[in-house]
A protein has these predicted regions:
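Surface-exposed amphipathic alpha-helical segments
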Residues: 2-8, 63, 167-199
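Conserved polar/disulfide-associated segments of primarily extracytoplasmic proteins
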Residues: 6-14, 40, 65-178
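Hydrophobic membrane-insertion alpha-helices, especially the h-region
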Residues: 14-38
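Alpha-helical interaction segments
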Residues: 23, 52-54, 130
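N-terminal "mature-domain start" segment
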Residues: 41-71
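Extracytoplasmic/secreted proteins, especially bacterial periplasmic and envelope-associated proteins
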Residues: 58, 102, 106, 185, ...
Length: 199
């Protein structure tokens, strides 16, 4: 009788061990599944096409799109507190002799009087699109103060990146603007945007 009781207890213990192992495996599988769903939701995109401007690109699905002049296309992450992360594309006429660096200088001249503490960080870096087209990449920073006088907030340093290319008699300016504290974690979104861009 003692042997039978011990045998039943061993069997019960073996079942418990398998139950524990199976529970751990299921829990890990569910965590991985949840992580996969989260990554999929964060990286979900929507397609934007504008045949008149010759632009086709995928942008983050949960961002607000705006197509009002002076830009062809602008999307903003409205879930951000403070400065809203922005990606925009605008075009300007460009003559045969116009260079991307001249457009970059003109942007600096236009922005300096309208933004606080505007400063060019890096200039004249070459950026190559997936179709091997060369363009100019420049980075800058400025201070953003919320225009609403009823909101008391600390000014935010904004970091911007411009990619300028000249095609078909027009300069195409792709701009990325983000809170400087979030630049490193947000630049991957801009890189995915550029990788999907067809001009």
């Amino acid at each position: 009788m003692i042997e039978e009781f011990g045998g039943a207890q061993d069997e019960y213990t073996r079942q418990q061990r398998w139950a524990h192992i199976l529970t751990i495996i299921v829990a890990v599988a569910m965590l991985l599944y949840g992580l996969n769903l989260r990554i999929g939701a964060l990286n979900a995109t929507q397609l934007y096409e504008n045949p008149e401007a010759g632009v086709r690109v995928s942008y983050p699905a949960n961002w607000l799109i705006d197509e009002v002049a002076p830009y062809v296309f602008r999307v903003r992450d409205m879930s951000r507190i403070g400065f809203k992360t922005t990606i925009q594309i605008e075009t300007q006429p460009a003559g045969d002799q116009t260079s991307a660096s001249a457009i970059m200088s003109q942007l600096d001249l236009n922005r300096a009087p309208t933004t606080d503490s505007y400063d060019r960080i890096a200039n004249n870096d070459i950026y190559i699109f997936s179709d091997e087209t060369e363009s100019l990449r420049g980075e800058y920073a400025f201070v953003f103060q919320d225009p609403n006088p009823f909101l008391q907030s600390i000014p935010i340093v904004v970091r911007g990146t411009d990619i300028i290319t000249i095609r078909g008699g027009q300069a195409i300016i792709i701009t990325f603007l983000v809170d400087a504290n979030l630049y490193d974690e947000s630049i991957a979104t801009f890189e995915r945007f550029l990788a999907s861009l067809e001009l």
